[in-house]
Amino acid sequence: MAAVVSAKPLCDSEPAIPAPPSVKEDNSNDTKDPEENSNDGSQPAKRRRMSGDSTPSCENSNQDFGSSYFPAENVIEYKWPPDETGEYYMLQEQVSEYLGVTSFKRKYPDLERRDLSHKEKLYLRELNVITETQCTLGLTALRSDEVIDLMIKEYPAKHAEYSVILQEKERQRITDHYKEYSQLQQQNTQKVEAGKVPEYIKKAAKKAAEFNSNLNRERMEERRAYFDLQTHIIQVPQGKYKILPSEMTKVSPYPVSLIPGQFQEYYKRYSPNELRYLPLNTALYEPPLDPLDPELLALDSDGDSDEVEEMKSEKKKTKGSSVRLSIDSSSMNMSESDNTQDTQEETPQPRPKVKEKSSTPRKEGSKRSVLSKSVSGYKPKSIPNAICGICLKGKDANKKGRSERLIHCSQCDNSGHPSCLDMSAELVAVIKKYPWQCMECKTCIICGQPHHEEEMMFCDTCDRGYHTFCVGLGALPSGRWICDCCQKVPATPKKGARKVKNSKEG
């Protein structure tokens, strides 16, 4: 029993050295029972055979383990092809021996592998990685990054051992490189002449300047922005701005009023053209048109903008002439009122009021100019062979088969029967007194613009067009609407007053 116990530690001990036959076995064999020794010798022989069989089996296992041991420094990582485009590989045979895996390909079939070419084998032979006999065999290459990942996941102890070897190799490489550099430096210092030192200094300064310029250029072009790992924000350099002198940016003693009515030095200067758009009392100009309005763009593309400008110029001319006529008529009325006071009481004549509404003086003048233009001897257009645009018939027959005169647009050649246009006789009588416009040519009386058709409304008495914002309305009115021109038409004198005047004159 002592021999069996002594054999187990030998199997668990270091595998390199086999255990010699112990003295305890001989002593145990000598001190056995005399009955066993008195036998034919078969029993002791059997026991010797069993003990002899058990001990060599342990020795064989130790020898196998010792032969399978592969040190980490023998695992070589190389680059193929050796130029800049190469990748790092390891030999599958070395990795399998180091990890102790016999069937490495069957155990890890997903790893990327390839067969070594003849040139690659010769390259490894020059590096003393493989022997001449291994050059004739079929070798397999594995990607080094996949092997390292496999060792980290499944063989951490092997990876720790291999990483220590890599660190030692890196230290040795740095040491050798430093030794070579120091030797070259010693050789160069011995060869340097005293007269060439200024030239070397200039070359060193030039190279340093080139390096600094390249570094600054990379910072400005390639590495301007960077990612902040703490805030996860991409930081971008701020742009350059021109700085004004301190005299121009100096703050005044009263920069802004803190309470309403307090003095402040800052104020905005408005031009006369800008003030006409502001509602100080009432805006004199209509709201400015949107330059990106599709209707306005289409109008400009069709060439109608010239017609609109001509209409504006004509209205300005007629406006000036109407103002002169109104002033002349007012002066004539003033002289007549001074001479004939009794006739003024019987036949009152309308006198233009200058300040009828303090808020809208210019609008009243423009409306009166339109009224005077429409009243002063206007004759409607006459087209002999005109055709109604609705029923497509002439003046001999309308849509009801009756003869009816056509009304004509003052801007274009469109014509139509009043019955087809749903116009009453009173409206037709008023239309003939001023240049009437059809629906396609209709413009606002105040601003003279054809735009904003959805905000255009028409007088029920004279059919003139007005924008809601030109007359101060927020929306289209519902029901009957009469413009100011029709509401302020001067009253016609009575027949009795005319007879009295004639009798007095007679």
UniProtKB/Swiss-Prot annotation:
Keywords: Metal-binding, Neurogenesis, Nucleus, Repeat, Transcription, Transcription regulation, Zinc, Zinc-finger
Stretches with biased composition (Basic and acidic residues): 23-35, 353-367
Pfam family, one: PHD
Gene Ontology MF: a single term: zinc ion binding
Compartment(s): Nucleus
GO BP terms, alphabetized: nervous system development
Zinc finger region(s), PHD-type: 387-444, 446-489
Highest rank taxon of the organism: Eukaryota
Secretion signal span: none
UniProt entry tagged with the keyword Cell membrane: no
GO cellular component: npBAF complex
InterPro entries in UniProt: PHF10_PHD_finger_1, Znf_FYVE_PHD, Znf_PHD, Znf_PHD-finger, Znf_RING/FYVE/PHD
Disordered: annotated segments: 1-66, 293-377
Bias kind Low complexity: ranges: 326-338
Annotated stretches, region: SAY: 90-299
Family as reported in the entry's similarity comment: Belongs to the SAYP family.
Quaternary structure and interacting proteins, as annotated: Component of neural progenitors-specific chromatin remodeling complex (npBAF complex), a subfamily of ATP-dependent SWI/SNF chromatin remodeling complexes.
Name under which the protein is recorded: PHD finger protein 10
Organism: Xenopus laevis (African clawed frog)
Origin organism lineage: Eukaryota, Metazoa, Chordata, Craniata, Vertebrata
